[in-house]
Amino acid sequence: MDLEAKVKKMGLGHEQGFGAPCLKCKEKCEGFELHFWRKICRNCKCGQEEHDVLLSNEEDRKVGKLFEDTKYTTLIAKLKSDGIPMYKRNVMILTNPVAAKKNISINTVTYEWAPPVQNQALARQYMQMLPKEKQPVAGSEGAQYRKKQLAKQLPAHDQDPSKCHELSPKEVKEMEQFVKKYKSEALGVGDVKLPREMNAQGPNRMCIPGGDRSTTSAVGAMEDKSAEHKTTQYSCYCCKLSMKEGDPAIYAERAGYDKLWHPACFVCSTCHELLVDMIYFWKNDKLYCGRHYCDSEKPRCAGCDELIFSNEYTQAENQNWHLKHFCCFDCDNILAGEIYVMVNDKPVCKPCYVKNHAVVCQGCHNAIDPEVQRVTYNNFSWHASTECFLCSCCSKCLIGQKFMPVEGMVFCSVECKKMMS
């Protein structure tokens, strides 16, 4: 790819979602504007997933690329125009008759994703076993949750070097090898089955979602109400409770045929969020989402959110950073050798701290320098000096003395307090 094409691609990436409102900050954010190298909005500092950005095609491309060159090619399709793999997510539309006074109307519910099984009754019951706020019904809180988890759990920059910032040729090669390795050793997609079906599942049968799907014989089991409350020989690998015979369970091939999960228990062992679209990574007998699997293998830069493939990086405040990304969160000035203050787990240089974050002294009404001693009570602060921490009535210095606080004022005695009331 020549320089002009690279610049154009970079520009398109930064134009994506431009101006989209922030769902978290509301009117406080002027609209989404991607930071040059951080994966956040320049205006409000929230991530792209917190903004109302339409990303359906982009997310399908990302997941499609993840499944490329794996056994899960049945879940992708390549566009004839550019050959880019696209994720063929299973969309489920349910129609429910609703009785009205004069006639019957039809209520349609669209799930933006559903497990790719032929038996729709099984897929429907799977959805009902998820918390309502996490069911991906189009236009709902659950659909927004799925969108957010797709961005959080499966970052494009964890699999595609072109989505990363200024990797060297050596780093690109190392990343490609890393991605190839986790695709072959850890990546998997859960499959929905009835526990009774596992008896017929042998170790020589591979179950690929979208390929070997549940058969229509499962319909009878779904409709057998007497079976719904019977327990089985299987227990959930997560919560350890028994599986009910008529309830769907999730099976993960890499975990083995002896492990099953309740739909709501198929979660990442680190963040404990539902594994989006049942996409998992298996390591040391644990389920991980893509992000936390990669975190267990490589250091991640707290500045740009990318995995670090360089041998040289810095560690500060129990986090890892590319050398060039240990910068002030407000102004982006490099902090190596400089005084900084951590604000919400983000490093901020001294000038920006004083300007944007420092508490104001109740005595002199000036910002309190981060290196200066202070006195704090509830939400109020004072310079720990004879000029500032004084009785609000008689101006007696209160350092080392007992005092009586009243909102933003302090008093040395009951008498002084009464005089000011």
UniProtKB/Swiss-Prot annotation:
Cellular compartments annotated: Cytoplasm; Cell junction, Focal adhesion
Transmembrane segments: none
Record remark: domains: The N-terminal and the C-terminal halves of the protein can associate with each other, thereby hindering interactions with ZYX.
Biased composition (Basic and acidic residues): 155-164
Domain LIM zinc-binding residues, every copy: 234-297, 299-359, 362-421
Region (Disordered): 133-164
PANTHER family per UniProt: LIM DOMAIN-CONTAINING PROTEIN (PTHR24211), TESTIN (PTHR24211:SF1)
Protein name from the UniProt record: Testin
Family: Belongs to the prickle / espinas / testin family.
Function description: Scaffold protein that may play a role in cell adhesion, cell spreading and in the reorganization of the actin cytoskeleton. Plays a role in the regulation of cell proliferation. May act as a tumor suppressor.
A molecular function (GO) term: zinc ion binding
Domain PET: 92-199
Protein species of origin: Sus scrofa
One of the Pfam families matching this protein, by short name: LIM
GO biological process, one term: negative regulation of cell population proliferation
Main location: cytoplasm
CDD domains: LIM1_Testin, LIM2_Testin, LIM3_Testin, PET_testin
UniProt GO cellular component terms: cytoplasm; cytosol; focal adhesion; plasma membrane; protein-containing complex
Taxonomy, superkingdom: Eukaryota
Keywords for the protein's UniProt record, in alphabetical order: Cell junction, Cytoplasm, LIM domain, Metal-binding, Repeat, Zinc
